[in-house]
Amino acid sequence: MTQNRVRTVFLLAHTGRPAAIRSAELVVKGLLRAGIGVRVLEAEARDLPLPGEVELVGEATPQCLDGCELLIVLGGDGTLLRGAEFARASGVPMLGVNLGRVGFLAEAERDDLDKVVDRVVNRAYEVEERMTVDVVVHRNGDIVHTDWALNEAAVQKAGAEKLLEVVLEIDGRPVTGFGCDGIVLSTPTGSTAYAFSAGGPVVWPEVEALLMVPISAHALFAKPLVTSPDSVLAVEVLPHVPPGVLWCDGRRTVELPPGARVEVRRGAVPVRLARLHHASFTDRLVAKFALPVSGWRGAPH
């Protein structure tokens, strides 16, 4: 007779936040009480009041999630994007609990922790896939860097003194060129992040598209562009101008020398997110940005 394998959840927390420490303690106790194993990074465990039953792993690699059914992330947007790196590399769904400000990637708030534990215990969640982008940097015809992003790849000026001089390209054809502070190349998920701050449109997650949003461009035609999800977007840094810098999800960066070319296309590997309820993205948008909807009556019945 084969023995049933113990269910295991990986917990990732921003241990610099007192709220994360308290939240982690509640989640761990609730899961262990239900007979679900919990795995935590050793470096984070030092800052958390964890019982001895918690499994500790020393190295932060995708393999540390082997055998886990879920990745629970406690923190703000930065911690959630860190969790997304683990989720993408391992294929394990991520369930985010927001301890920061907006937290569009999060599925629950700190006050919902009891519900989160209950839903995980009963497997009462669904998994959806979010589109990513793959990023390639070329220099003199050679590939010099590859990366990916869940929210956006941002090409920005490296210094404050001068504008970044670029030419934009879509599907192998030039579109326009100008001096700017940068260009945000975004997914629909990222449309409520940096692209939103740069004046880009909000795109519902179920809409498949790529966005190209200029940042403070010195040009008459500098509007946000929305393309097919199968388009290839490119930004070329002009030769003989100051260098730029590439940021992926605001976490990973590489310098872009003059003449560098950044290509962005639909990612081969999505990020899987665990969802606890069927709230529409419209309701999520209203709640996250505290949008005024008083006076709304709705369609007549």
UniProtKB/Swiss-Prot annotation:
Catalytic activity: NAD(+) + ATP = ADP + NADP(+) + H(+)
Entry keyword annotation includes Cytoplasm: yes
GO MF terms held by the record: ATP binding; metal ion binding; NAD binding; NAD+ kinase activity
Listed cofactors: a divalent metal cation
Annotated GO CC locations: cytoplasm
Entry annotation: catalytic residues: 77 (proton acceptor)
The keyword Transferase appears for this protein: yes
Subcellular location: Cytoplasm
Key words of the record: ATP-binding, Cytoplasm, Kinase, NAD, NADP, Nucleotide-binding, Transferase
EC number from the UniProt entry: 2.7.1.23
GO BP annotation list: NAD metabolic process; NADP biosynthetic process
Name of one Pfam family that matches: NAD_kinase_C
Positions contributing to NAD(+) binding: 77-78, 82, 151-152, 162, 181, 192-197
The protein's enzyme class: transferase
Function: Involved in the regulation of the intracellular balance of NAD and NADP, and is a key enzyme in the biosynthesis of NADP. Catalyzes specifically the phosphorylation on 2'-hydroxyl of the adenosine moiety of NAD to yield NADP.
Family: Belongs to the NAD kinase family.
Database matches in PANTHER family: NAD KINASE
Protein name: NAD kinase 2
Annotated source species: Streptomyces coelicolor (strain ATCC BAA-471 / A3(2) / M145)
